[in-house]
Amino acid sequence: HIQNLRYIQGGVNMTEKILKNNQAVVAGEIISDFEFSHEVFGEGFYFVKLRVNRLSHSSDTIPLLVSERLIDVTHSHIGQYLEAHGQFRSYNKHENNKNHLVLSLFVRELEFIDSMENRKPNMIFLDGYICKEPVYRTTPLGREIADVLLAVNRAYGKSDYIPCICWGRNARYAGNLSVGSRIQLWGRIQSREYQKRVGENNV
């Protein structure tokens, strides 16, 4: 969910931008146990779910990908509060002959906290390139919205593909941008739970 965005001209210095072009911080309550994801050179990485409250009293469930070297993954931490800093990442998971884009926050630093007081629980900054024609539309209630797929460069020639949503004047602005445009955006990470209609009577 994008709150502010900016169009950038010119190239990007990869050595300076590898970490700076994708920054996120979330704070909330752990609501799951750890689920093994993968191992790199003997270091295990695990998924855990964090519930992050919005100002509107609803909440988002954000998957964290965390190293066993940052937290004791053999114990349950359900009900504890955590602040995590890292990068929002994506990968394609092949399941039932379909590709599914999996999004998670790759945690670089974390801290257990006593409460959410004076915390800004959900912020993200991305600097990347539009890799699909933006889709601008109006909702049935008259709200302007634009879908943007952003490619954010990572080290070793990899990229993360992050679907973003803009509202209002940001939606109008983003709807006129072309593929290959470099933009910077500030916003929040949002879980997208929706019902998809697959037939006349089925959702």
Sequence positions of predicted segments:
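Single-stranded nucleic acid-binding surfaces, predominantly the OB-fold ssDNA-binding core
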Residues: 4-203
